[in-house]
A protein has these predicted regions:
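A metal-dependent, Asp-based hydrolase signature
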Residues: 40-46, 54-95
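Active-site neighborhood of HAD-like aspartate-dependent phosphohydrolases
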Residues: 1-51
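An amphipathic alpha-helix signature
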Residues: 27-35, 39, 62-67, 128, ...
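Asp-based, Mg2+/Mn2+-dependent phosphohydrolase catalytic module
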Residues: 1-5, 128, 132-232
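Generic enzyme active-site microenvironment
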Residues: 9-11, 123, 183-184
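Short, acidic loop-to-helix structural element flanking the phosphoryl-transfer center
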Residues: 90-122, 128-132, 164
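Alpha-helical elements of Rossmann-like donor-binding domains used by nucleotide-donor carbohydrate transfer enzymes
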Residues: 29-36, 68, 109, 113, ...
Length: 232
């Protein structure tokens, strides 16, 4: 399919990196990292409690959700967040190094194909150090012109999607117009970020239930990353 795009922006986790790991539950490595952070303060929570008390507020409220969690347990939010980030970054890098986190099937081939037609960029809600490591570890750096993850300080949670902060930064750095860009993401919140940036989008997977939460329809739908060649 012929397109007029000049840059394809790729989300990382769930798009070309399978971050679920090898545990019995998805992202078990991340739960274990969080439990390690809690253990430092003498706190023990189940996975269900972590989901309810921390992850759900983190996703919906960002930094305010983290502060509310810390208030619940009498923790200093800046100190706790710094420890949490350190532990989860170390765990994610180790999971990639040891083979627990791998590329999604077909990712390298389609990334190589796309890099021959477009500029490629990464815009991820994962930490910058994890994005750097993933591209280096999986030998993907040569294919990408630019890549962004978020900073690890608490206030940087505000730059996560649906905020188009890093999409806009890529367009600025490459001196491209909005009509020149398309974002590929596996989450509807990413599609909303693309809408907020005024660019086209591709949604990987058909999670209708999650899509209902967000006001944004993708330009294209594909089942997996290998199908990108059909629309780009």
């Amino acid at each position: 399919m012929e397109t007029t795009y000049q840059v394809v922006l790729l989300d990382m986790d769930g798009t070309f990196l399978d971050s679920r790991g090898k545990g019995e539950i998805p992202t078990e490595w991340a739960y274990e990292a969080f439990k390690k952070s809690l253990k430092h303060y003498g706190i023990t929570l189940t996975i269900g409690e972590i989901n309810n008390f921390f992850l759900a507020p983190l996703r919906s409220e960002g930094a305010e959700g983290v502060r509310n969690f810390c208030d619940r347990f009498g923790l200093d939010s800046e100190e706790f967040w710094a420890r949490r980030e350190k532990d989860v970054i170390e765990a994610k890098i180790e999971a990639m190094r040891s083979g627990g986190i791998k590329l999604c099937e077909g990712s390298e081939e389609i990334i190589k194909y796309l890099s021959e037609k477009f500029y490629l960029a990464v815009v991820s809600d994962s930490q910058q150090v994890c994005v750097d490591y993933a591209l280096e570890h999986f030998n993907l750096k040569p294919y990408f012109t630019i890549w962004y993850g978020r900073k690890s300080d608490l206030k940087s949670l505000a730059t996560r999607k649906p905020n188009p902060f890093y999409i806009n930064r890529v367009l600025h750095e490459l001196n491209l117009r909005r009509v020149d860009a398309i974002l590929v993401d596996d989450r509807p919140v990413g599609i909303l970020a693309a809408k907020n940036a005024g660019i086209d989008s591709v949604l990987i997977g058909h999670n209708t239930k999650e899509r209902a939460k967000y006001d944004g329809e993708p330009t294209f739908l594909v089942k997996n990353i290998s199908e990108l060649g059909r629309v780009l």
